Amino acid sequence: MKKVLALVLLIILALCLVCCGKDKEGICISVDGEKSTGGALTGEISLKKLSGEYTLYFGDANGEALQGYTKIGEINENTPYKMEKLVIPPDAKTIVAATGEGGTYFAKIPEEYLLNKENAFIFGALSDIHFNKYNKVAEDDAVVAFNNALDYYEKIGADMVGVAGDLSNDGELSAYTKYNEAISGRSFPVYTVTGNHDYNAYKDKSWQENISVGIKGCEFAPNGLDFAFYPNGPDGDVFAFLNITFYSYSYFEKTRPVVSINEQIPWLEGILKAHTDDQVYVFFHLFMCGPDGQSHTGVGNLMNPGGYTYPLPFQKGNSDERRIRRFFKEYKNVVFLSGHSHWAFEMERYNEETNFSNFNGEYCYMVHIPSVTEPRWIEDEDTERTGKNGELSQGWTIYDYGDTVVLVPVDFLSGTVYTEYMEIIHK
């Protein structure tokens, strides 16, 4: 009987714990083995033979806090830190506890929960560059912001960068010239779609002549505008770039589709049907309303206590929107990436779905991309938004490991990586 009891206790211990830090014997990571997965931890972090207040960070193999990463949280001898699907960034090997007095302790993250970055397809997700629109800190703030972001992706070894539209102020040719200059000579391809500010350029064919012509290694749709990128060949994962082909601010035209029902919708549906067992990333400019039909509950939007919300979603109930919404309910292997509202990552405080959600499994995962040039900010009682160009410049670095996707939010200006907004998808 004693042997059976001992065996049971060993099994429970293997499932529910452990990795107590032997380095400096400072902290202990207790892992719930049933709820933790590759790339994310559930359980708790506690102090071991220590007292006082400590701040937790992700660290490297030597127990040094990863540079630029925001804190995980706080801990003291009476209150362990509860991990609820704590996403592990690609470079993390340890969790570090530090005090203001200089005391630092760390514990190793169990290796079975670490993902091998060498096996990942790494891509950046940017939006709303807006050349020629903002000049707070430079002759053209977008030139500085976009080039800085691309330099960041060069440094981390990105394989591709996708942009969710609005390259220009109003479809002007000079914006596309600046865009092409910025992406020229990069070690990775940069692909984009049209935004509402770019629509004029599409209408007069300037887009195809200046942007589409530079897209190589992709399969174009019959309209010569939309295209698919296959990083591992046509039988694997796919990136679909879906463009706005009409846009109007007029109340009388708000029910007119921005995506062609007869051309673009069948093209997108064909890709989705052909890749039900693969990851499908869809880049599109406009964000969707929430499941309740409200703009402010969708991924990509919010409403602050003062009542402000960004007023221009992908119009709920339009014929194109209904079809695409149905796709996103049916094909849960899709990751939908959009921009348009510019909201900074921090604005998630007004809507927990602002940055990322699948609405409890009702839809595919949706991702909001802030503006790389002018992330927007709003306080509780503000009735207008504030542009943070020159102060913030944000986007995502996304690691596709094959069966897991880790999304890492970045501010390119400061080099900050937002630990609290990291997300994970298990395919």
Where are these regions (language model features)?
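Recognizes extended acidic, P/S/T-rich segments that occur
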Residues: 58-91
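Extended active-site neighborhood of metal-dependent phosphoesterases/phosphodiesterases
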Residues: 173-275, 279, 323, 329-330, ...
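Active-site-proximal segments of metal-dependent phosphoesterases and phosphodiesterases across multiple
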Residues: 138, 252-259, 275-338
